[in-house]
């Protein structure tokens, strides 16, 4: 996976809070109640720059129609075989050594990865992610601590019933990646993209925060101002899950 450089993001993120606040402007979904409510929620925080909501889209407790899933963090040392499976799916199987050729080296690196400042984490929850009335086993994989690390990404994946494998069909709708490579795995292009889940009036949504897109050669960041998007997956009349972009926001800096 090509690394997504966020050093500048980290610097700007840590600017003092007294910098004039900006706001997220709704550019798609103005007629949707949830989109308007979500805009009010994110703008209720001190947005001294567009990166405040990068790591996690916070919820203001005053907006009682919103809430988050109950996430539980996994012990990645005890579940290191599971971690290998997840990272293989995400195209990261050789980023931290080769677990097949040299498992001892891979485990040594893993100990540093899960205890250091830039720790990799996996959180799990049961969420009705496709709004069909049945809860799925959903995990959120965090590539590194945010905003402390140079590289970051957060992906959402759905597991099968016994949590032994990734359910590819149910995971596909969650991979709303701006850059999907035809020659790569299904999940290629999620790096630098921060996914999250929220619930509004008992309906489950997922959103995507993106700093920018990579150029064709993968070396240059092309900034985009459509940073935050919200998606909804629901079954159609035939029972097929359909995913739609419901809201789109761009950040407007204070003048």
Q: Where are the regions a protein language model picked out?
A:
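Beta-propeller blade repeat segments, especially FG-GAP/WD-type strand-to-loop junctions
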Residues: 148-173, 198
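Acidic, small-residue rich beta-repeat scaffolds with periodic aromatic anchors
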Residues: 18-92, 181-255
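Sec-dependent N-terminal signal peptides
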Residues: 4-15
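Acidic, divalent-cation-chelating loop motifs in proteins
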Residues: 124-132
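Short coil/turn segments that connect the beta-strands within blades of beta-propeller domains
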Residues: 134-135, 202
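Short glycine/acidic-enriched loop and turn motifs that connect beta-strands
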Residues: 144-147, 211-213
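Repeat-based blade/solenoid architectures
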Residues: 114-122, 175-192
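Hydrophobic beta-strand segments that make up the repeating blades of beta-propeller
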Residues: 137-141, 206-208
């Amino acid at each position: 996976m090509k690394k997504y450089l966020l050093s500048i993001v980290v610097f700007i993120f840590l600017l003092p809070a007294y910098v004039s606040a900006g706001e997220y402007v709704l550019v798609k979904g103005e007629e949707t109640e949830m989109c308007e409510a979500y805009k009010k929620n994110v703008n209720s925080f001190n947005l001294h720059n567009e990166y405040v909501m990068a790591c996690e889209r916070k919820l203001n407790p005053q907006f009682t129609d919103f809430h988050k899933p109950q996430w539980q963090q996994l012990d990645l040392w005890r579940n290191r075989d599971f971690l290998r499976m997840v990272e293989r799916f995400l195209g990261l199987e050789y980023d931290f050594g080769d677990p097949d050729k040299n498992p001892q080296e891979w485990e040594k690196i893993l100990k540093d990865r899960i205890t250091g400042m830039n720790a990799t984490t996996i959180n799990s929850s049961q969420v009705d992610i496709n709004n069909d009335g049945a809860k799925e086993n959903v995990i959120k994989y965090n590539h590194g601590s945010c905003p402390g690390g140079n590289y970051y990404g957060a992906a959402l994946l759905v597991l099968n019933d016994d949590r032994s494998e990734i359910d590819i069909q149910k995971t596909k709708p969650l991979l709303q990646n701006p850059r999907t490579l035809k020659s790569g795995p299904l999940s290629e292009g999620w790096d630098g993209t921060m996914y999250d889940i929220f619930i509004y009036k008992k309906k489950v949504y997922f959103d995507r925060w993106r700093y920018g897109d990579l150029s064709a050669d993968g070396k240059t960041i092309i900034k985009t101002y459509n940073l935050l998007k919200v998606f909804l997956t629901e079954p159609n009349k035939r029972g097929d899950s359909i995913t739609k972009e419901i809201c789109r926001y761009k950040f407007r800096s204070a003048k």
